[in-house]
Amino acid sequence: VLPFSVFEILRRTGKISDFDATFALWAVLIGQILHNCDIRLSKRIKQEVRSGDIVIRLMDPTNYVLAKIAGSLGFFLPSFAVYSIIFIPIVYFLLPIKFNLIVLLLFTLIAALISNLIGLLIGMSSFFIEENDGIELVVGKLMFIFGNQVIPIILMPVWVQNIARTTPFYMALSAPIDVASGKYSSLLAFGQGVIYILLLLWLASWMLNQIKRKLVING
């Protein structure tokens, strides 16, 4: 019933309350670009753990966490540039929308850092939980639900919207276009992004120390 109701209302007014169909399509586009540019760091680390390569990599003097994040960004940035050059001009021509490109790029970088740090934590957790596919599945679903990819956040109950916008999943997919188009406070989003990056970095460093300690104990 809901899809047909939405279609009927959109056909007459183009809006449902504060919901803008054009913006919703842009949110899905940017979210999908961010998702497709993800290197799937969790799966790569999981393979390292299962093959034992992680032991060799941990012996490298380079910080494991920073090396993984730098490598992920090295893949993400060129991929994002290619996708953006191909798709954004086409969609902008068909569905023009006002947004700040510099702000979009800044929060895209923040989103990439948060997304890769989450993937890093999931991958490293496989050192302690051999079958952690369930964790990855749940996080992936939360990322899509709170990242504006399933149901537009604006159509959710207000209390769910408030919760969604405080999560790292929102910051990883939906925040860049929301902030760039002025639908969410840039100052608030930047603060959230910095806090999440620092928190996730701390968790990754703590988990890395636990892995090293376990390796020493087990020889």
Tell what function each PLM region has:
Residues 1, 33-37, 69-85, 113-117, ...:
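Hydrophobic alpha-helical transmembrane bundles that constitute the permease/transmembrane domains
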